């Protein structure tokens, strides 16, 4: 078994309220990405990846278009990135990435989630040193040597390549995301990526069970219910 990167479909939105919240989070992230990196997905690979991911998660086209149009206008809110770290139920390590127009409010909201499960938010760097900030690509394939050669020819600092069940998984530093994706598409054409994003990948996992699992799931629900929270990374295994 390979590295345990997060599957962002762990908690699928089942109700209309949950779906609306997912759409809102994607809309905000697409807006920020387009505003900072350009509205053309062909020139902004991060935006292209984000749009593809939104479509896979069944985000309506009008939500995506509205966010890009908003970025095109140059107006709208200013969102800042905010990252919080700490220890969750069962001494698990957690990183919470946010986009916020009011960092003080966001910090208070995230801290309340920790407090509700009798855990404490930590200082910056308290757990992130136990995660690798990685670009991750997963796609169908059988020849990891050819993949490695293509990436090395493009001077990508490959962290790891795994081959399992007819799928190739590539790990590279997050700073090499664009370079790695360009190298893969140049070498192998229009790849249909199962995973194509930047994540924090835990170096080690913490196994939880029983009541700890219930508390941890509640903790994730509390965090994901916050409008400002975009992604939650953790090292829990259960």
Curated annotation (Swiss-Prot):
BP terms from Gene Ontology: regulation of DNA-templated transcription
Any coiled-coil regions, as ranges: none
Main subcellular location: cytoplasm
Pfam (any one): TACO1_YebC_N
Keyword list, A-Z: Cytoplasm, DNA-binding, Transcription, Transcription regulation
Listed GO MF terms: DNA binding
Organism: Marinomonas sp. (strain MWYL1)
Family: Belongs to the TACO1 family.
Compartments where located: Cytoplasm
Transmembrane is among the record's keywords: no
A GO term from the CC aspect: cytosol
NCBIfam families per record: PRK12378.1
Name of this chain's protein: Probable transcriptional regulatory protein Mmwyl1_2868
Highest taxon, organism lineage: Bacteria
SUPFAM superfamilies: YebC-like
